[in-house]
From Swiss-Prot:
This is Adenine phosphoribosyltransferase. The gene is apt. Belongs to the purine/pyrimidine phosphoribosyltransferase family. It catalyses: AMP + diphosphate = 5-phospho-alpha-D-ribose 1-diphosphate + adenine. Catalyzes a salvage reaction resulting in the formation of AMP, that is energically less costly than de novo synthesis. It comes from Picosynechococcus sp. (strain ATCC 27264 / PCC 7002 / PR-6) (Agmenellum quadruplicatum). It is found in: Cytoplasm.
Length: 172
């Protein structure tokens, strides 16, 4: 299936000169969504990834993460922006192009030695995925892989990530 044909291009968003890859059209396509989820699971199986948890980054990692976790017989754990999780959290602050941001995970969600696959819809510069990996590594987790629907190759986000397989279905 040609998944690229199911992704809408939005020029000059969020600012001039940026071509935004909108996956909402893929999400709205039943066969495309099924194919995407099956292909993500297959990528993980072929890479022999056997996580204890799939960690989804806010917010589109929440769309793909639970189904991926279910199919890999793993738990699903969300990583959120500040103030969204109500129990005690671990936090990490990371640099953005213009400032900083923070990510949080419940303290009781993962533990030292847990094998983790991190999932999101898209990797561009890799900043959020790197911060998520740093947060989990600080806890003592073992990052065994990263899974993305879309990878923007020219931004070289995978080069910023720790040494673990980086799997993506669609590359631009």
């Amino acid at each position: 299936m040609d998944l690229k044909s199911l992704i809408r291009d939005i020029p000059d968003f969020p600012k001039p000169g940026i071509l935004f890859r909108d996956i909402t059209t893929l999400l709205n396509h039943p066969e495309g969504m099924r194919y995407t989820m099956d292909a993500l699971v297959q990528l993980c199986l072929e890479a022999n990834l056997k996580p204890d948890h799939v960690v989804g980054m806010e917010s589109r990692g929440f769309i793909f993460g639970p189904t991926l976790a279910y199919n890999l017989n793993a738990g699903f754990v969300p990583v959120r922006k500040p103030g969204k999780l109500l129990a005690a959290v671990h936090t990490v602050e990371y640099e953005l192009e213009y400032g900083t941001d923070t990510l949080e995970i419940h303290q009781d969600a993962v533990g030292s030695g847990d094998k983790i696959v991190i999932v999101d819809d898209l990797i561009a510069t890799g900043g959020t995925a790197k911060a998520t990996a740093e947060l989990l590594t600080k806890i003592g987790c073992d990052i065994i892989g990263f899974v993305f629907i879309v990878e923007l190759l020219d931004l070289k986000g995978r080069d910023r990530l720790p040494d673990a397989p980086v799997l993506s279905l669609i590359q631009y």
